[in-house]
Swiss-Prot record:
Family: Belongs to the NusB family.
Gene3D superfamilies the record matches: NusB-like
Protein name: Transcription antitermination protein NusB
Any Pfam family: NusB
Gene name tied to this protein: nusB
Single GO term (MF): RNA binding
Keywords: RNA-binding, Transcription, Transcription antitermination, Transcription regulation
Entries under NCBIfam families matching the protein: nusB
Biased amino acid composition, Basic and acidic residues: 1-11
Organism: Corynebacterium jeikeium (strain K411)
InterPro entries in UniProt: NusB-like_sf, NusB_fam, NusB_RsmB_TIM44
Length: 202
């Protein structure tokens, strides 16, 4: 019975993978590489470069690294501290980042990078795809807590964006308040013209 259920799960994951587009597959490859890098304790960018080199020779039977994967992995590596800080901030007291399954960390980092550093991806898409990766890779509890973490990061970013807009609007209003209004300026011009005219008549 257990073997049948395992086979069914694998079949379901395979079918789900086929339904997803190229970007999902690129995210999936990025998770694989980040997981491998942590397991081997090496720079994930080195793995990307290695795979790119090996893929040039068909005899190696290495799949080409998608362009988006080549963007994600260095992005995560470069901004790792900021990503981990954002993730840790939204973990419940029951979870600690360094004690999470390595695959969960990889999924969270990929999705968090998209939220924080890739404006081309709509935030909700980054969240949904991250949860989907968790469903495919990790344990049953992973999707729900990963969704909560990513949703928290997204809300923080939206709040920061709203505050920037509010600050810019306030600064603009303050600048306008310091300048004479158009009506006052016109009135001043009229008074000056009157003074000049009286001077000419005199």
């Amino acid at each position: 019975m257990t073997e049948e259920r395992t086979a069914d799960n694998k079949a379901a994951k395979a079918a789900s993978f086929k339904r997803h587009g190229s970007r999902y597959k690129a995210r999936r490859r990025a998770v694989d590489i980040l997981f491998e890098a942590e397991f081997r304790d090496i720079d994930p960018v080195e793995i990307v470069e290695e795979r790119i080199s090996l893929a040039k020779d068909s005899a190696n039977q290495v799949k080409p690294v998608p362009e988006y994967t080549q963007q994600i992995v260095p992005g995560v590596a470069t901004n790792l501290d900021a990503l981990d800080e954002a993730i840790a901030l939204h973990l419940s007291s029951d979870w600690q980042l360094d004690r999470l399954p390595a695959v969960d960390r990889a999924v969270l980092r990929v999705a968090a990078w998209e939220l924080k550093f890739n404006d081309d991806v709509p935030p909700q898409v980054a969240v949904v795809e991250g949860v989907e990766l968790a469903s495919e890779y990790s344990h049953d509890k992973a999707p729900s807590y990963i969704h909560a973490v990513l949703d928290g990061i997204n809300k923080d970013l939206q709040l920061q964006a709203d505050l920037k807009i509010a600050d810019a609007s306030a600064a603009k209003r303050a600048e306008q308040a310091e300048q004479p209004g158009q009506a006052e300026s016109d009135e001043l011009d009229g008074l000056l013209d009157g003074v000049v005219q009286e001077s000419d008549e005199a």
